[in-house]
Amino acid sequence: MTALLELRDVVKHFPVRDALGRHAGAVHAVDGVSLSVAEGEVLAIVGESGCGKSTLGRVMLRLIEPDSGAVRFAGEDLARLSPSALRARRRDMQIIFQDPFGSLDPRMTVAQAIAEPLRLHRLVPRAEESGRVAELLRRVGLRPENAGRWPHEFSGGQRQRIAIARALASNPRLIIGDEPVSALDVSVQAQVINLLRDLIRDLRLTFVLVSHDLGVVRHVADRVAVMYLGRIVEEGPAEQVLGAPRHPYTRALVAAMPGAQTKTPPLEGDVPSPIAPPSGCRFHTRCAFAAERCRAETPQLEGAGHAVACHFAESLPPPAERIAALGGGERLARLQSFFRGTAPSPIGMGDQA
């Protein structure tokens, strides 16, 4: 498949200063990440809080400038685009933010918020704006007659639907979803995930999902990339990464899923500081299989199809855990019940979160 988005050795560090304003190091948010996303594919980037996944998502859109490396979209190096060319290219790249309460301007009505990208990119004549806004609201399960209302009049789930409608307004080829359902109630999460699945299928979208919730990821993603302290430690098809994880960190994440049937012990210790990450394999301070080589030598992400950055991936014992969805788990069971037959509300005014 043709790659729509390509990242090569992308690095992003954030400088840290002490109380006197002196340089005191840097946060290693993204360190040498290389990824590709095929046209029409859903890639999930997962990991613990602070691993760099949200920063990576913003770097993909050049909302944050990388320190080094290349980000190519549809064959173009985004770093080489002029401001005007980048502005025009943004029509094809959109983002859905995590917080539905903070991502909408409280001084703009729903119609104004959704129509803004239409005007910025001059996509439809002014006379046709209201019709396009109504069409987008219907597509995300909201009533067009509520277009004149203000964001504070909607629930969290409804606001996130509005944010999705706004992201769709410019007919993008790529959408980044930065934890798009993590702030919502579980039942509302299921509705929004179901909506996203339908949109991805019907509009043939390329979607990058940033998430810490493997239960959500399993229902949406074609491929999964696992991040730890700014680096990709495992990447491959979702069924393989979540069903037969090869990296010790991925195994621990899968084992921590609600309802997982596993003998894998939970991770011990805290995540090391991203200001001073460990040498060699950054996971060695918490890994039960770590050896001296792990402390001294950085493992490379290797493997055709299912890649892993671990010196001992081939010699590790088979993973003991199974995906929670196979064994049960109340939360995932509730999600699955929605996927089996409950479509998003055609009105969209019943969300409670």
Indicate where each model-derived feature is located:
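Short catalytic/signature loops enriched in Gly
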Residues: 3, 16-21, 26, 235-341
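ABC ATPase NBD coupling module
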Residues: 19-24, 78-94, 120, 127, ...
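Conserved ABC transporter NBD signature motif
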Residues: 69-77
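Conserved ABC ATPase "signature" region
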Residues: 77, 128-145, 254
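Conserved ABC ATPase signature
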Residues: 150-154, 158
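A short, proline-enriched helix->beta-strand linker immediately N-terminal to the Walker B motif
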Residues: 169-173
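P-loop NTP-binding/switch modules centered on Walker-like glycine-rich loops
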Residues: 176, 180-263
